[in-house]
Amino acid sequence: NCLAPVFIKLMEDGWVTHLATNGAGIIHDWEFAFQGHSSEDVRANVPRGEFGTWHETGFYLNLALVAGAWRGMGYGEAVGAFVEEEGLEIPSEAALEDEIARTVATDPYQAAAAADYLGKIREFKLEPGWMAVPHPFKRFGLQSNAYKLGVPFTSHPMIGHDIIYTHAMNHGAAIGRAAQRDFLAFAKQVENLENGVYLSVGSAVMSPMIFEKSLSMSQNLHIQQGRHIDNHFIVVVDIQESHWDWRQGEPPMDNPDYYLRFNKSFNRMGGQ
């Protein structure tokens, strides 16, 4: 919604220490960096069987995730690096085969990531070497700027929710590896939330769901050290109206506001 320059400035000035989004946020931000716009007529394209089947978005984002998972990156970091570096290095099949043989006994997870990458390289007949992918509008990309500034940018996708799942380059194992790293990175930031602010904008499900798990994990660690996270400030911004005064506690179950997850979950998280 054209606020990327604002968030980039906030990162540059040190006001934002972590950014998180869902899979769609990753896609739109990448498309702006790649081509300067992001839109699609869903109503027209679904009947034609063309919704979300854009080659560039599906191919490049999925490839960045497969490569990033192999490199030990999270979801957002993998895409941010791909944009900022304007491409990626495709390893040779022989190099990956050798890595698999060397690591399968001692690091089977890395061997599996290498095997995933090898499979996609063979499937799409990718030549080894540098694959240049210009991103002429990357100055507007949140992911690339976060990567450049060293600010964690995490993605918390749901399988099948996003258009990249319609492309043959999509690989669930790579997405799972990258997304799990991002969840743990998000939880690590929540661990440092004491005296901080959590701003949730327009996320009715993803934000409250990952936050409550992350806060619980963080409280567990703090309690073991004789501490507790209590002095945090949560701001929920959403266009959907709530007619309940949450300062009174939760509404009864027969009140529709009870089912506004983005209010109910955060109301249970303590702080202010």
What are these regions (language model features)?
Residues H28, E40-L149, S155:
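Ligand-binding beta-strand-loop-alpha-helix segment within the catalytic cores
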Residues G176, A185-Q189, N195-V197, A204-Q272:
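C-terminal functional extensions of proteins
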Residues G25-D29, H161-I164, S207, E241-H243:
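Short gly/pro/ser/thr-enriched loop/turn and capping motifs at secondary-structure boundaries
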Residues H18-N22, H28, T154-P157, L199-S200, ...:
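General beta-strand structural signal in soluble alpha/beta enzymes
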Residues P134-H135, P157-M158, H171-E191:
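A general structural motif
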Residues N1-I27:
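Active-site cofactor/substrate anionic-group-binding motifs, chiefly glycine-
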